[in-house]
Design a protein with these regions (language model features):
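Non-catalytic accessory regions of SAM-dependent methyltransferases
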Residues: 1-37, 42-45
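Conserved SAM/SAH cofactor-binding pocket of Class I
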Residues: 98-200, 223
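Mobile active-site "lid"/loop adjacent to the S-adenosyl-L-methionine
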Residues: 191-220
Length: 285
């Protein structure tokens, strides 16, 4: 760095560059700079005239280039907040989205505070959904499944750092590891993006298998609707996240496999993103 440059000037310059790839350019710049100087964000506001040394400037430049290349902030910082928990994330896991908190909220509405139910999270990734439910319903026993050993390693790390012990993590393909078991509630944020969706390009840094679900984006949801009746208790609850444009198709799939009391819920943007259904074994035998 040929000349001294203040924190405020670095923030302005960085935010201007990041505006091309981020809707939260100033925040991204603050987080990256705080990381580069190994100080909390509040330090930036209290010391805007302080200058950066060469080592900090080099660290900032490296992370800026990663962000400008489209890498999610969560992968650069290694963490993402979800349900007021700071979760570890890695390129082996999807970055937890704020809209997925709706899925947690819908599930919790149906689970009494003192319930001791068996609950299953399919495709757990970083463990965000399972950890949120396990923390809110500490008498329940959660089982969280993912096909990726690397994702499960991250999920276990999150459970350990949050000291949440009422979760078992299993590796396998969807319901296969729990064949013969029964659960009162099953939750899942499965892949639901069509392989032809142009949005995949903007999500290229994230694991494609956790996003893409066949030609129409409904392959995984169809599999869950078909297979979950075998492992759900009578009148058990299924809660799924899906694309905003998939509301009617998801309802049709659920009905075709005998699910009842199907409801859809809008996220904070007014988009239909989560559906729930119950399965009554007594009415399908």
């Amino acid at each position: 760095m040929s000349e001294e440059i203040s924190i405020e000037q670095v923030l302005r310059d960085s935010a201007a560059r990041l505006a091309a790839v981020s809707d939260s350019a100033r925040l991204d710049a603050e987080l990256l700079l705080a990381r580069a100087i190994d100080m909390p964000r509040s330090f930036l506001f209290a010391h805007p005239e302080d200058t950066l040394d060469d080592a900090a400037f080099k660290r900032l430049k490296q992370t800026l280039e990663r962000r400008l290349a489209g890498e999610p902030m969560a992968y650069i910082t290694g963490t993402k907040e979800f349900w007021s928990m700071e979760l570890i994330v890695s390129p082996a896991t999807l970055v937890p989205r704020p809209e997925t908190e709706l899925l947690v909220d819908i599930a919790l509405r149906d689970i009494p505070r003192r319930a001791d139910w068996p609950i299953l999270d399919l495709g757990t990734g970083s463990g965000a959904i399972a950890l949120a439910i396990a923390r809110e319903r500490q008498l329940c026993q959660l089982t969280a499944i993912d096909i990726s050993a690397d994702a499960l390693a991250v999920a276990r790390q999150n459970a350990n750092q949050l000291t949440i012990s009422n979760i078992d993590f299993l590796q396998g393909d969807w319901t296969a590891p729990v064949a013969g078991q029964q659960f009162k509630v099953i939750v899942s944020n499965p892949p639901y993006v069509s392989c032809h969706d142009k949005a995949l390009e903007t999500l290229r840094a994230e694991p494609v298998d956790a996003l893409q679900a066949g030609e129409d984006g409904l392959e995984s949801i169809n599999k869950l609707a078909r297979d979950c009746p075998a492992i759900i208790e009578d009148n058990g609850l299924l809660v799924l996240e899906h694309g905003a444009e998939q509301r009617n198709q998801v309802a049709e799939i659920l009905m075709s496999y005998g699910w009842q009391h199907i409801q859809c819920y809008d996220d904070l943007s007014g988009l239909p993103r989560v559906s729930s259904a119950h399965f009554l074994h007594s009415e399908t035998t």
